[in-house]
Amino acid sequence: MPTLRPYHPNDAAVPTALYVRSVRHYGPRAYSPEQVAMWAATADVARTAARCGDGRFVVVAQDEAGSLLGFADLEADGHLDLLYVAPEAERLHVGSHLYGAIEAHARRRGLHRIFVEASELARPLFERRGFTLLGRNDLVLDGVDIHNYRMEKRWVEMEVQGLP
């Protein structure tokens, strides 16, 4: 089972490299070589460091040796921006552990929803976690057509008074 811990600023290069490896490994299962190349090219260490240091909640998963297995983030408004798992951690439920930490954090913060733009590959993970499909985004990035899905999960915290 992976260990979850908060992101540390010294981690910036590692999640960026993991992001690229993840996109290149999993991407071809649902996207063309051109789409995968464009997606992987969006990785940038400085941008990762800026994003992860801007106050959002960032959690990383690591193995016993301290190697990064995945990472995820949640912005203050409930937007889950990134959730990536290393190819060598496939089928170890790292994505589920990361998502669980994200949702627990959102609930502790008093949020009532999480929303995401999920890739074709991530959509099933979010559907299994109770997300609703809101629509498909058809995008052109750097001249390449690609798509993702707008999804959200809402919950209501209920207070029942007068019950034991």
State where each predicted segment sits.
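Alpha-helix N-cap/helix-start capping motif
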Residues: 68, 119-120
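Glycine-rich phosphate-binding loop
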Residues: 93
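Conserved active-site tyrosine of GNAT-family acetyltransferases
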Residues: 126-127, 131
